Amino acid sequence: MGKNNSGSRNEVLVRGAEQALDQMKYEIAQEFGVQLGADTTARSNGSVGGEITKRLVAMAEQQLGGRANR
C-alpha cells in the first residue's frame, strides 16, 4: 500500500463525498441514539461505522444490479 502523508488511511476518492458521508454518519448515530465523540465507547462509535458500511454496500449493490438488468 502507498504511504498517505495525512496520517489517515481514509481517503475520499470522490469529490464532495466527504460531506455526504459525514451527514450519513450523524443521521445513523441519531437513529442509534449514539452521541459521537471522544467520550463515546469504541463499540458505540464502531456500530455507526459498521452501519455506514452496510448501507454503502447496499447502495452499490443496487446500482450494480440496475446496470446488470439494462
UniProtKB/Swiss-Prot annotation:
Keywords: DNA-binding, Sporulation. Transmembrane segments: none annotated. GO terms for biological process: DNA topological change; sporulation resulting in formation of a cellular spore. InterPro entries: SASP_alpha/beta-type (IPR001448), SASP_alpha/beta-type_CS (IPR018126), SASP_DNA-binding (IPR050847), SASP_sf_alpha/beta (IPR038300). Gene3D superfamilies: Small, acid-soluble spore protein, alpha/beta type-like. PROSITE patterns: SASP_1, SASP_2. The record marks 27-28 as: Cleavage. GO terms for molecular function: double-stranded DNA binding. The keyword Glycoprotein does not apply. Pfam families: SASP. Belongs to the alpha/beta-type SASP family. SASP are degraded in the first minutes of spore germination and provide amino acids for both new protein synthesis and metabolism. SASP are bound to spore DNA. They are double-stranded DNA-binding proteins that cause DNA to change to an a-like conformation. They protect the DNA backbone from chemical and enzymatic cleavage and are thus involved in dormant spore's high resistance to UV light. This is Small, acid-soluble spore protein 1.
